[in-house]
Amino acid sequence: MNTDALKKMAAEAALRYIQPGMVVGVGTGSTTNFFIEALGAAKIHVDGYVASSIATENRLKAQGLNVLELNATGDIPVYIDGADEADPHFRLIKGGGGALTREKIVASAARLFVCIADDSKDRPMLGKFPLPVEVIPFARSFVARQLVKIGGSPTLRSGITTDNGNVILDVTGLDFSDPLRMEETINAIPGVLDNGIFAHRRADVMLFGSAGGVIERKA
């Protein structure tokens, strides 16, 4: 099975968490795109979907699905999104698609966070994938220097402006022995909007597509 088939398998398995009448949060990225396609085919009568990016909003609308503003919604029972890495403690690295800040906001607003991925994202420890950090452009050089001081090697992601009007620094070389502490340390740097460590708001359920079928884990 190729990677896309595994992603699609995990995405379709997430449909079991969607019930009629819900408001559903939807993430951003290649695996989530398969989930959006599955939603369009399933035609579950939910109240609406809260998108974590403009790209996701456009994809949902292209499927004829009702998109709601986060500020106009109350309870979000479930949020479905992918990950670039996941560890055994349900902590994640996200943001390869550049939507990490809005993803973290919608995930934090949801009661249940279901993460979908192919099984190559299942790692014993975070840190192989470069960590995305969303930075206000004015502070880019300053933030990069601070990241170097804590052991990181930041690279500006070229050609990318986030939906919030910011830039992304992709950082390698960081110590992920304590992801929660690293998340807090980076977010304390002035000029950082957020980073792609999801340790405060971990996933509640992991669905990994694998050659043997869907692997489901619950926190």
UniProtKB/Swiss-Prot annotation:
Pathway, according to UniProt?
A: Carbohydrate degradation; pentose phosphate pathway; D-ribose 5-phosphate from D-ribulose 5-phosphate (non-oxidative stage): step 1/1
The reaction(s) catalysed by this protein are:
aldehydo-D-ribose 5-phosphate = D-ribulose 5-phosphate
Q: Which UniProt keywords apply?
A: Isomerase
Binding residues annotated for substrate, in chain numbering: 28-31, 81-84, 94-97, 121
Question: InterPro entries annotated for this entry?
Answer: NagB/RpiA_transferase-like, Ribose5P_isomerase_typA_subgr, Ribose5P_isomerase_type_A
Show the stretches that span the lipid bilayer. none
Provide the GO MF annotations for this entry: ribose-5-phosphate isomerase activity
Q: Could you name the active-site residues?
A: 103
According to its UniProt record, the EC number is: 5.3.1.6
Per the record, its GO cellular-component terms are: cytosol
GO biological process annotations for this chain's record?
Answer: D-ribose metabolic process; pentose-phosphate shunt, non-oxidative branch
What HAMAP family is this protein classified in? Answer: Rib_5P_isom_A
Oligomer status and interactors: Homodimer.
Q: What does this protein do?
A: Catalyzes the reversible conversion of ribose-5-phosphate to ribulose 5-phosphate.
What family does the entry list?
Belongs to the ribose 5-phosphate isomerase family.
Task: Note the NCBIfam families from the entry.
Answer: PRK00702.1, rpiA
- Name of protein: Ribose-5-phosphate isomerase A
Species in which this protein is naturally found: Acidithiobacillus ferrooxidans (strain ATCC 23270 / DSM 14882 / CIP 104768 / NCIMB 8455) (Ferrobacillus ferrooxidans (strain ATCC 23270))
Q: What is the lineage of its organism?
A: Bacteria, Pseudomonadati, Pseudomonadota, Acidithiobacillia, Acidithiobacillales
- The gene name on file is rpiA
